[in-house]
Design a protein with these regions (language model features):
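Arg/Lys-rich, positively charged N-terminal/basic patches that mediate binding to nucleic acids
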Residues: 1-45
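Enriched for short, Lys/Arg-rich terminal
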Residues: 2, 74-104
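A broad, structure-centric signal for solvent-exposed, well-ordered loop/edge residues
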Residues: 18, 33, 56, 83, ...
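Residue-level signal for well-ordered alpha-helical positions
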Residues: 22, 52, 97-98
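General N-terminal targeting signals
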Residues: 26-28, 39, 43, 66, ...
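A short, surface-exposed loop/turn module that caps and links secondary-structure elements
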Residues: 47-76
Length: 104
């Protein structure tokens, strides 16, 4: 049995900016804790890519391929969000996060 490969997850500035905007928007509607709780849930799922990234295949979405030629996609939070990432050596680089309805 081979050992499971693990990666270091790197989140791009674009994703961090999108998550911050998401937290602020949710906080403006509900409470500040709600925005941070939702973003922390997303960050937890992104962190799981450290051991699950190999389970995904290259994306068939043109939008994902335009971000990186070897892009892979993952849907999270009840399929509401699509994460575009790629593997580079020992790293999983999270490139973007989109509402799932907008990716094509």
């Amino acid at each position: 049995m081979t050992a499971m490969r693990t990666y270091q997850v790197i989140i791009s500035y674009a994703v961090l900016s999108e998550l911050e905007a998401m937290a602020q928007y949710i906080a403006s509607i509900y409470r500040p804790e709600s925005g941070h709780k939702y973003v922390n849930r997303i960050l937890g799922q992104l962190a799981a890519l450290s051991y699950s990234a190999d389970a995904y295949q290259y994306s068939r979405f043109k939008m994902a391929k335009s971000i990186h030629p070897k892009a892979e996609t993952l849907t999270i939070i009840n399929r509401k969000w699509t994460v575009v990432f790629h593997i580079d050596g020992d790293f999983v680089i999270v490139d973007r996060i989109f509402p799932s309805k907008t990716i094509f």
